[in-house]
């Protein structure tokens, strides 16, 4: 392997000649061969947005020459294009401030910027610390990049997937509004409900999650940049944080602002905890929806079989013809993983000892993973399951007509105890509810027909 020699304050080190990173990245790569979880590229892009904005701000404040500013902006734009992804090899499991990833970005930006300056016949050169990292610390850059990445992924991935599934459920809700089925509570028969009403509950869960997500993501717009090492802003111009937030906003289209309290921004990540709490709530709702769907589709001959779902692949390696609710199973596993991630994010956020939380990479990793899993899970579940949900009306009608809980409609006319006697007699003697009611003498056939109307029971008001 061809190498070149790079150096840092620890001395010289060999770096692969075809890679753009420098000495500190190479040391981290060697010192932390832990796991396979790479630092998400979206965090790198968040850093690139930040370094780009910092160069513009430092130029405005007289801290950086125009040539250096242009070179850094060019390098950051190259990173944002996705063409340099291979030059960011570090894993999540590194220093808790994310210093190695900050330096990885600084070194790659410096390398590309120097090539740019050389191509433009400039005598200037870019240093990863003195120029790319000017007015910054890893302690305020990593949380800034984290917030930029999280907000963007919620906006571009999670919310569209949530809306997609929500809209599909709304279509099913409206389509099945005339189908009356038996309701169930405690896994036991209950009073009737429309299939559309049942699905409306699922849909409204997603409506509420969409509202909560919209609210919680607002707090992610606060950026730590400008706090530098411990929140005091040492080595940064007083206007630096505001200017960087402004430039990031202009380039992303999102209204980021500089946090009003940098001490909080460095040592606490409660905004991310709140955001992930919303992700956990969404995961819980998706778990419920997926479980309901697979129970209602259970069968085909010895289950509930009130709805059918798409058959996407063989379900068993030994039982021919078996088809399983695989999309539901996928979504419930996604939900479990997100719930576990929430525990990690909550505990990690609590570890802000003194002026700095040093669990930032794992907070970032778990939150982004939850966003990706939920977004992909909802989209896949929607396209391969939800859109194909159809009622099996023969079974639905059969369960409804056999239900003893229709007796509830007699309560206002004959009282709870007599109605209970009718239901128990029907169950014990294998009678229909109508047969039992007439045999007890509590109601006539005409009264039963007038009072037991499922269509009235699902819309009593």
Curated annotation (Swiss-Prot):
Family matches, as PROSITE patterns: FUMARATE_LYASES
EC number(s) on file: 4.2.1.2
Protein name from the UniProt record: Fumarate hydratase class II
Domain of life: Bacteria
Site description Important for catalytic activity, residues in chain: 329
Keywords: Cytoplasm, Lyase, Tricarboxylic acid cycle
Any one GO molecular function term: fumarate hydratase activity
PANTHER family: ASPARTATEAMMONIA/ARGININOSUCCINATE/ADENYLOSUCCINATE LYASE, FUMARATE HYDRATASE, MITOCHONDRIAL
Oligomeric and partner information: Homotetramer.
Catalysed reactions listed for this entry: (S)-malate = fumarate + H2O
Role description: Involved in the TCA cycle. Catalyzes the stereospecific interconversion of fumarate to L-malate.
Binding-site list for substrate: 97-99, 127-130, 137-139, 185, 317, 322-324
Note: There are 2 substrate-binding sites: the catalytic A site, and the non-catalytic B site that may play a role in the transfer of substrate or product between the active site and the solvent. Alternatively, the B site may bind allosteric effectors.
UniProt pathway: Carbohydrate metabolism; tricarboxylic acid cycle; (S)-malate from fumarate: step 1/1
One Pfam family cited in the UniProt record for this chain: Lyase_1
Name of encoding gene: fumC
UniProt organism field: Staphylococcus aureus (strain MRSA252)
An annotated GO BP: malate metabolic process
């Amino acid at each position: 392997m061809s190498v070149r020699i790079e150096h840092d304050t620890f001395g010289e080190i060999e770096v692969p000649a075809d890679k753009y990173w420098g000495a500190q990245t190479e040391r981290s790569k060697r010192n932390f061969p832990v796991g396979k979880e790479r630092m998400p590229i979206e965090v790198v892009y968040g850093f690139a947005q930040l370094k780009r904005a910092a160069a513009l701000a430092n130029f405005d404040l007289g801290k950086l020459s125009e040539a250096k500013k242009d070179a850094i902006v060019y390098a950051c734009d190259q990173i944002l294009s996705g063409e340099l992804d291979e030059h960011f090899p570090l894993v999540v499991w590194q220093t808790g401030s994310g210093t190695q990833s900050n330096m990885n970005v600084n070194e790659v930006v410096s390398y590309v910027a120097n090539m740019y300056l050389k191509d433009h016949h400039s005598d200037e050169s870019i240093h990863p610390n003195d120029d790319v990292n000017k007015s910054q610390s890893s302690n305020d850059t990593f949380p800034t990049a984290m917030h930029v990445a999280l907000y963007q992924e919620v906006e571009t991935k999670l919310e569209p997937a949530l809306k997609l599934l929500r809209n599909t459920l709304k279509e099913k809700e409206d389509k099945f509004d005339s189908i009356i089925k038996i309701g169930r509570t405690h896994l036991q028969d209950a009073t009737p409900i429309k299939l559309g009403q049942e699905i409306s509950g699922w849909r409204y869960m997603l409506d509420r999650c969409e509202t909560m997500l919209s609210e919680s993501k607002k707090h992610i717009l606060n950026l730590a940049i400008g706090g530098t090492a411990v929140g005091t802003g040492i080595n940064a111009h007083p206007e630096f944080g505001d200017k960087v937030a402004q430039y990031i906003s202009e380039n992303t289209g999102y209204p980021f602002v500089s946090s009003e309290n940098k001490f909080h921004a460095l040592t606490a990540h409660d905004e991310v905890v709140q955001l992930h709490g919303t992700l956990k709530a969404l995961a819980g709702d998706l778990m419920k929806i997926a479980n309901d769907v697979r129970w209602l589709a259970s069968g085909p001959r010895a289950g509930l079989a009130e709805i059918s779902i798409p058959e996407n692949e063989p379900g068993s390696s030994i039982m021919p013809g078996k088809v399983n609710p695989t999309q539901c199973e996928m979504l419930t596993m996604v939900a479990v993983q997100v719930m576990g991630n929430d525990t990690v994010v909550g505990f990690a956020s609590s570890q802000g000892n003194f002026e700095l939380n040093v669990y930032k990479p794992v907070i970032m990793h778990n939150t982004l993973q939850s966003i990706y899993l939920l977004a992909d899970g909802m989209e896949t579940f929607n396209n391969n399951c939800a859109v194909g949900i159809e009622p099996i009306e023969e079974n639905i009608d059969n369960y409804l007509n056999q239900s003893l809980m229709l007796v509830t409609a007699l309560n206002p006319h004959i009282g709870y105890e007599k109605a209970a006697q009718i239901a128990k007699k029907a169950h014990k003697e294998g009678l229909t509810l109508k047969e039992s009611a007439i045999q007890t003498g509590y109601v006539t056939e005409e009264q039963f027909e007038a009072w037991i109307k499922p269509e009235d029971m699902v819309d009593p008001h």
